[in-house]
């Protein structure tokens, strides 16, 4: 931001930037402190300077001194290498206007450039943005560069203008953050004393994935100084851990982080998963969780096969009762089969008169064969004979009813049955007494039984209608 002064003051600088990238818009302040006067400069990216003068030099007393103190950097440090960076300022002051021009001799300019180039080559083959200022204030005043900006946000410089002509001051050796053309958002820090750089990767935001890549400490020269057993890939539990981590330690040249955040290696994830799977397999292989058919004994020779169902049902009930408790009482009750008791000598459809199966006979019905034709096989057609009707009222032979052959016994005779077959019985008794029993005639009579009954029923119905 340009600040207008009541006096006419113009300061120009010569831009010197090897890297063509434009950094973020920042201001550069330079203060000249001496026993008599103090000058503070503020610069922008467009190359122009804004001068804040002390009231003893000019009448610009309305500028606040708080703005100057807020832009100061750390004070001058001791025990540093002495660098010769001297600039000559010529100052011309008139009564009506103050005009400042920047001038620097060709010999002194080349010497300053050589000093900066030597410092950069000693630090390593890295991209460096120099912020040299060539300022001419006149009046034979000298300004010495005190320090470099410590970060991208703090890009202000402090200059000292003593009352003497030229003095040599210690330059503060601080790592400078430099933007590097890379596919990730990273920053290279150059340390002039240690002659090696440290790659620092900026953390991602909290909206990113939970597991982010931690800081990879890899010196630019390939050595392993200051880091013990670095891991190529490390994961952290939360991306917010970077907020509490300390920044680069510029004095030691390595990155220090707090110990209360634990890191987990990628390989440990696989080991953890393997242990979890092993625990699950051990639990499933336990005797309480397995259900096999080893406890079920199958014997095909036994008559009662309910033992198979009973044993499996008992195992199932024991497993369910031990695991779930009293909630499965109704579930187990569904499988309980109640014995059926019959009353009043009731019987089932099972034929109890059949003989028990012989255990010695392996194949049942191995002699059975299909009857295709009676003439071909040699089986005679069954004949009709007189059957005793003591146990059953009638019998079925070849699909024909034999109840009309002989009269029923006295204990089961009914008037309805007698009336229905009286005519047929009388005719057959006469035939039986007159001649011998004829099979062909009997078969013919049996085949015509249904037709005679239908004719009799129809004739009786017609007679009733005629009456």
Curated annotation (Swiss-Prot):
Residues 89-102 have a biased composition (Basic and acidic residues). Residues 28-42 have a biased composition (Low complexity). Its main location: cytoplasm. One of its GO terms (molecular function) is transcription coregulator activity. GO terms for biological process: negative regulation of ribosomal protein gene transcription by RNA polymerase II; regulation of transcription by RNA polymerase II. Residues 1-42, 62-110, 151-170, 341-361 are annotated as: Disordered. Interacts with FHL1 to form a repressor complex. The formation of the CRF1-FHL1 complex is inhibited by the TOR pathway. Transcription factor, corepressor with FHL1 of ribosomal protein genes. May be involved in the blocking of the spread of silencing. This is Transcription factor CRF1. It comes from Saccharomyces cerevisiae (strain ATCC 204508 / S288c) (Baker's yeast).
